[in-house]
């Protein structure tokens, strides 16, 4: 890994709402990333189960963490709040009931850098009480033009509409926000905005 001071800042936006049973593992996995130059933005969206207090506790332990407490407004509004304060050249999103592999952002950063890309993507696991399985992993690296990426995204093949399995260049979100009070907000942002702007 390169010197942290020479690496671009990655802002990771994490909406948090009543996920105390999962939140500690989530935050540990983010704080433990091999890519160290992180700004970790936790948006406590009016939690009532102690999740907000746990966010504050982690912020006391790790100076890279910023916590914003707001009245419950939904995931889109929480992500928008994070976008408004994010300082990084690169953006990532993590759902607060998920955890990520220790080298996820190092891996995604090197994919961006080595391929001159605007967005990089990785596979993911689905973990249940019974089993864990890998989703959308061919074991191969692929590079897409903007047109190919949009077509693949719309056809729902190797690229999915999730925000949390990708790393984005910040400029893709200039003037872009998640639609509030709308289901499948990931699709609106992925197809309509960021992928159309990517090169």
Regions found by a protein language model. Name each.
Residues 1-197:
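Nucleotide-sugar donor-binding/catalytic module of glycosyltransferases
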């Amino acid at each position: 890994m390169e010197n942290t001071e020479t690496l671009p800042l990655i802002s990771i936006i994490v909406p948090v709402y009543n996920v105390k049973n999962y939140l500690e593992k989530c935050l540990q996995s983010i704080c433990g990333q091999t890519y160290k130059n992180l700004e970790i933005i936790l948006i406590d969206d009016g939690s009532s189960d102690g999740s907000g207090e746990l966010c504050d506790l982690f912020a006391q332990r790790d100076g890279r963490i910023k916590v914003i407490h707001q009245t419950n407004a939904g995931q889109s509004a929480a992500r928008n709040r994070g976008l408004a304060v994010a300082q990084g050249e690169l953006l990532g999103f993590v759902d607060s009931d998920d955890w990520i592999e220790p080298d996820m952002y190092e891996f995604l950063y090197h994919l961006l850098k080595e391929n001159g890309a605007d967005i990089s993507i990785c596979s993911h696991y689905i973990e249940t009480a019974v089993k864990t399985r890998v989703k959308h992993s061919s074991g191969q690296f692929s590079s897409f033009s903007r047109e190919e990426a949009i077509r693949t995204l719309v056809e729902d093949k190797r690229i999915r509409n999730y925000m949390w399995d990708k790393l984005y260049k910040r400029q893709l979100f200039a003037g872009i926000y998640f639609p509030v009070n709308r289901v499948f907000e990931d699709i609106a942002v992925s197809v309509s905005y960021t992928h159309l702007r990517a090169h």
